[in-house]
Amino acid sequence: MPITDPVKLQIVYNRVLNKKVCRKCGALNPPTATKCRRCKSKNLRPKKGFKLK
C-alpha cells in the first residue's frame, strides 16, 4: 500500500533513504559523511530510492 500523506512520506525519506552508501564496501553512512566509517574510502554515493514530488 503506497504512502500518500506528505508528512509520512518525508519521515520515510529521512529515516530510510537519506543515507550515503560506500561504493567500495557497501556500508551505510550518515548523509553528512565525507568518508566511509568502515573502510575510510571517500567514494560515497547517495542511497538510491524514490524521488519526492
From Swiss-Prot:
**Which UniProt keywords are present, listed alphabetically?**
Ribonucleoprotein, Ribosomal protein
The source's domain of life comes to Archaea
Q: Which GO terms describe its cellular component?
A: ribonucleoprotein complex; ribosome
Show the Pfam families listed in the entry.
Answer: Ribosomal_L40e
Please give the biological process terms from Gene Ontology that the record holds. translation
Q: What Gene Ontology terms describe what this protein does at the molecular function level?
A: structural constituent of ribosome
Q: Does the keyword Metal-binding apply?
A: no
Q: Does the keyword RNA-binding apply?
A: no
The record, for Gene3D superfamilies, names: 4.10.1060.50
Note the SMART domains from the entry: Ribosomal_L40e
Q: Which HAMAP family match?
A: Ribosomal_eL40 (MF_00788)
Instruction: Describe the family membership recorded for this protein in Swiss-Prot or TrEMBL.
Output: Belongs to the eukaryotic ribosomal protein eL40 family.
Q: What is this protein called?
A: Large ribosomal subunit protein eL40
Organism, scientific name = Staphylothermus marinus (strain ATCC 43588 / DSM 3639 / JCM 9404 / F1)
